């Protein structure tokens, strides 16, 4: 990482019974090896104490993080408290994870934190306390005053970035959910995100087809002709560099990846399978279209291994590194 933001990052620990507290603590332990900038952990200190015996220091202002970070993990204590038992999610833990997320987003929105990195949460537990959003992405978007339809989920690694047009949709419903306007909107959000977050002045977006061989001229489906090509044409008319639709099976080898900055894919697995095959340990979830930077490691709570010192901190470290890079790029542009 060549640049760091001027302000610290805010990291929500996620569900206290999951691996979030452990991987954040391990990131602080290995901050030099991972080349991490100062960050503030937000959660219940007891969730750290159950999995880690390192030093932490409570702070009430992110500006204090720089002075603390060298010798202790700076920490914001949340109002909802639940130290939790690793591997045993509770309703109290759901309140804890939601409170930490709320505070992290608030710090970023106020400008006190350069970016938000969100730890993994249990949607099942959140739904049990009345959480009304499909996931953290939609919650963050609402708090930022952005319609969830105007954000995009990017999965990013060192050599590949992918964005699905449709996300958590049953495969049987993908074709009926697609529209030229949706493809165009996701493409535009992606291109703007490549400029703002990644500092790419003239990004190139490669668009996949939906059907085998990108429809084979309409022989294997007409979505490419009726939906995808019009969306590409509209983006090109705005001056963006967009290619496709390309057959998805030839888009992700090394030579193909060198020809674009991000791939816009039609459905969830079309985007996530190549990313996870190539960047399983260091793939990062980046939410595009927000006024703040938000990243997350591409893994869940892993309750089955929580508290056993088995959690790999590399995905969280990658999410922190990417948040710092995106925040620094925005600061330079502003």
Predicted regions and their residues:
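Small-molecule pocket liners
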Residues: 39, 137, 151-152, 161-163
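Ligand-binding beta-strand-loop-alpha-helix segment within the catalytic cores
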Residues: 155-185
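Short, flexible loop segments at boundaries between secondary-structure elements
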Residues: 143-160, 288-304
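Contiguous, glycine/small-aliphatic-enriched amphipathic segments in soluble metabolic enzymes
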Residues: 1-138, 177-266, 270-293, 299-301, ...
